[in-house]
Amino acid sequence: PRYDAGMPLTNLPDRYGAVSKLLHWSVFVLFAYQFVGANIMTRLPRDARVFGMNGDFFYDWHKSIGLVLLGLAIARLIWRRTTPLPQWHPSLSEPERGIVHRLETWLYWLMFVMPVTGYLFVMAGGYGVKLFGITDLPNPIGKQPSWSGIVWTLHVLLAYVLLIVIAWHVGLVLKKHVVERTGLANRMLPFRK
C-alpha cells in the first residue's frame, strides 16, 4: 500500500504548504477574535458579564492574544523569508499582482504594528499585561501618560486600516475564486493538498 503523507509542510510551486496555511489561518482567526473581543470589552461595564466572563477577562485575553499574534507575525515573517513562495497564480494580471504585493506588505506591517501599539498603550497607560490572567509582565517603559493616549488612538485607527486591508484581500480572493472561478483560494484553504 502507498503511504500518503498528506499535505506537504513546505510550499509547492502551485500552492501553499501546511506551515504557511497554519500560520495564515491562525493569524486570521486570532485577529477576528481580537476585533470581536475589543468591541465587547470596550462596551462592557467592568462588573457586567458576558458568557460568564467580566470585562477584565476580555481585557486580559485581548492583551495576551495580541502578544501571541506578535509571536505569530515573527514566525510568519521568518517562514516567509526562508521558504520559497508558490508561483503567482496564472489568473492574476500584472496590475492584480501589484495590488496583492501591496496588500501583503500592508498586512505584514499591520501584523507587527497592531500588537506593538497595543502593548505600548497598556504599558504607557499603566494598565500592564496579565498574561492569560496568570502572570504580570514587567513594564519596561514605565507609565507615560503624556503619550499613552496618542498610542491608543494610533492602535484604534490602525485596527480600522487593518479591517479595510483584510476586506480588500478577501474581496480580491473571492472575486478570483467565486466570480471568475479560477480556483485561486484552493492554494490557501486548509485541508486541501
Which residues does each predicted region cover?
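Membrane-embedded alpha-helical bundles that constitute the cytochrome b-like, heme-associated redox core
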Residues: 2-193
